Structure formats: C-alpha cells, structure tokens
Amino acid sequence: MEKLFIEGGRPLHGSVKISGAKNAALPLMAATLLAPGKHILRNVPELRDTKTLLQVMAELGVTSQRDGDVLTIDSTHLKHCEASYDLVRTMRASVLVLGPLVARLGQARVSKPGGCAIGDRPINLHLMGLETLGAKCIQEHGYVDVEVDGRLQGGTIYFDVPSVTGTENLLMAATLAEGTTVLQNAAREPEIANLVDMLVGMGARIEGRDSDELTIHGVEQLGQADCVIIPDRIEAGTYLIAIAASGGAGKVTHCQPEHLSALLTKLRATGLLLEADESTISISFPEGKTVSDLSCVDIKTMPYPGYATDLQAQFMALMCLATGSSVVNETIFENRFMHVAELERMNADIKINGGSAVVTGNGVAGLVGAPVMATDLRASSSLVIAGLAATGQTEVRRIYHLERGYEKLEEKLTGLGARVWKEQS
C-alpha cells in the first residue's frame, strides 16, 4: 500500500490547473445509460471513482474509451441491469445507475451501498421517489430491486432535505417518464446544473435550472450527448487553502469562481487577499503578514450555495495555523470530524462537542509532522494541507482516499514547489 510523504515548511508558489469535477463526472457518466449511442464527455478527471463507475457500467454491457480528458461511452448494447456488491461497496455514487436503468430498461438490481465513513446516507429518498413515479421497490438480501410496468409515470416528489444524489437519480429517471415530474426542495449544486445541461442537450425537457424546484416533462427517447464537465470547485478550494496554509501565494486556473463564493468570503475574512476573474483565482498575504496573523473565522456547512461540507476539513486545518479560536459547525453529515484525531497527532488543539468543533490555533509553529491515516476523501486532503504547513515530515497512509477525488495530486503539488513523494509500504 502506498504512503504519501510531505516535507513541511515550504511555501507554495505558482499556478495550478483545476481538473473536471468528480461530482459532476459521475452523474453525467451515469446519464449516458439513458440513451443508446456513443456519448462524448469532455474534461473528465481520471480518478479512482471514475474508473470504478466505468467498471460498473462495463458489467451492464457498456463500453468506453478514453483519449486524454475525453471519454467516449457507448451504451448501445446496454443489456444487464445489475450493479454488483463488489463494485458498489467501493463507491456509494454507483447508486446513480439506478434511475437511468429503470427509466430505460424498466428494471434495475443494485447492491445497497452500505455504511459510509462520514455518516449515514441512506438511499430511501431515491426509492421513495421512484415509487412515486410508479416503480415497485424491494429491498432484500443486500440488494435493491426496482421494476416498472411500461414507462415511469410523472409525479411530484418533495425532498425533506436537499439530496444531491437523490435529485440527480430522480432527475435522470424522470426524463423518460410519461407526463410531468416536479422535484421540490431539490439540491441546487452546480454539478446538478451541469447534469441538466447535458440532459437538455440530449433532448430532455427540463425547467428550473439552478433552482430548488425542477420540472421535467418526460419524452419518449433521448439522443446522444456531447458535454463538458465543469471544473472541480472542491479541488480548487483545496488548493487555495493549501497555498494559504503553506504561507505562499499563487493562483488556481480553469475554475469557476462563482461556485466558490462562500469559501472566498471566509478566506477574505481571515485577512487573505483574493482576486478572481472569469476562470482564475489568485490568493496571497498582505505585505508583511504570515499565516500566524490570520484572523480566526467560524464556518457552518450548508447545502449549496452555503459553505460546502466537502471543504470543512481543509478549512479546519487552516484554522489550526491561525492564532486564537474558531468554531466549525457541521450540519450536513453527523460523523465528519474523523480527521480531528489525526490532526491532533500533529499537535492540533481541537475540541468536539456534537456537531461543532472548537479549533484553537497556535500559529504557524503549532503543527508538527507525524504519521497520520486518511479516513475519507476530504479528511485526507486536510492532512495533506496540515503536512505542508507543519514542521518536519508527515506520512499520510491510506492515500487511496486521495486518489478517489484528486487528479495528479503529487504532480500538482510538486509544480507549486512542495516536497512530496510516494513510497510503497
């Protein structure tokens, strides 16, 4: 198993190009199951998660070919409807094939994803929505079996809480339903807007893009897709925080700053200088200021356009380097402080109280390198950020979590001047 080693204390400088968004690529890949033909997706990141979903789709009879960041998916010969446990257990997003399979084939058999390191994320919302559209759902022996006689039927679905994958799954299913479907209190993430754009390009009739109410007028069939994946806002935010934590200055390119408004507001509140244009964000310190001079800032995770839960751990690592106390409130997942114990191994001072964590920063000299273990994707990136700022060497284990969501991480950090390398254990 590989480990990532980081030699701390080297300020990052330069620019880093942001890859396509993992959280957009996965639903758009699943959406190609809705229609036969060759579908072209551009700016697709090469990640452990995208590879896993391609394996799931291969089991269904789909073929694919990658040329750089262009992925061609041929779903002409889609014939199987079962997503097996061996693959679904490694990535919860595999459940995104459920809606498209039921809509196109009239049936689907998908392994239940099981538990998740960062909290309970049941698929009940997906199933209740499909039942509203006329499907029969049975859960037994670790699988979900969904069937419908004929076409799905339009209906009104209300989400008690905005669910990103639930919105995506039911949005895809509804495109081929008979009649009109309304999704109320739907999630509003930019990745969902990206999916809407792709589906409309395939011939779907959808109203309400960027809003919490989506109206889908079902059509009998969809055509082939040719769509560009939006930039990864979480990757962009991670690198901005990493540059700040290292005490450096730089910029992220090929991003969409409007998708990061909440983070940029919080970073400016710490005293950092940020400038953004159409596709680039620059970050630096005021003259004569260092990481230790940063103001402590509280954050509260919220559904988009609020502060993203996927950037909570990274911001916490930055606050460990400020001087004073800040509060991190996590409202999306009930168990998303697993990185705290590992940060404490690096001398961080963090106290957890339910869904809140109080971070007492001790300045740039507060963190020291240590062996740490990644527990999930975003927790692992917070450990990398802490390692970049810490005194001495940090060893991050279980880096397969990083490979799920960060394309060419080692190469990109090295390009910014970091001293990072991988070794086999």
UniProtKB/Swiss-Prot annotation:
Q: Which GO terms describe its cellular component?
A: cytoplasm
Q: Where in the cell is the protein located?
A: Cytoplasm
- For the ligand (UDP-N-acetyl-alpha-D-glucosamine), the binding residues are R92, D310, I332
Q: What reaction is this protein's catalytic activity?
A: phosphoenolpyruvate + UDP-N-acetyl-alpha-D-glucosamine = UDP-N-acetyl-3-O-(1-carboxyvinyl)-alpha-D-glucosamine + phosphate
Give the sites modified to 2-(S-cysteinyl)pyruvic acid O-phosphothioketal: C116
Pfam families for the chain: EPSP_synthase
Which residues are noted in the entry as phosphoenolpyruvate-binding?
Answer: K22, N23
Please provide, alphabetically and separated by semicolons, the GO molecular function terms listed in this UniProt record.
UDP-N-acetylglucosamine 1-carboxyvinyltransferase activity
Classify the source by domain of life.
Answer: Bacteria
List the active site.
C116 (proton donor)
Q: Which InterPro entries match?
A: Ankyrin_rpt, Enolpyruvate_Tfrase_dom, Enolpyruvate_Tfrase_sf, MurA_subfamily, RNA3'P_cycl/enolpyr_Trfase_a/b, UDP_GlcNAc_COvinyl_MurA
> Does the record's keyword annotation contain Ribonucleoprotein?
no
Question: Which CDD domains does this entry report, sorted A to Z?
Answer: UdpNAET
- Record-annotated disulphide pairs: none
GO annotation terms (biological process):
cell division; cell wall organization; peptidoglycan biosynthetic process; regulation of cell shape; UDP-N-acetylgalactosamine biosynthetic process
Q: What is its EC number?
A: 2.5.1.7
Q: Which UniProt keywords apply?
A: Cell cycle, Cell division, Cell shape, Cell wall biogenesis/degradation, Cytoplasm, Peptidoglycan synthesis, Pyruvate, Transferase
User: Broadest EC class?
Assistant: transferase
Please name the pathway.
Cell wall biogenesis; peptidoglycan biosynthesis
Q: Which HAMAP family match?
A: MurA
Q: Which family does it belong to?
A: Belongs to the EPSP synthase family. MurA subfamily.
* Function (record text): Cell wall formation. Adds enolpyruvyl to UDP-N-acetylglucosamine.
The family database entries (NCBIfam families) matched by this protein are listed as:
murA, PRK09369.1
Indicate what this protein is called per its UniProt record: UDP-N-acetylglucosamine 1-carboxyvinyltransferase
Q: Which organism is it from?
A: Desulfotalea psychrophila (strain LSv54 / DSM 12343)
Q: What is the lineage of its organism?
A: Bacteria, Pseudomonadati, Thermodesulfobacteriota, Desulfobulbia, Desulfobulbales
Gene that this polypeptide is encoded by = murA
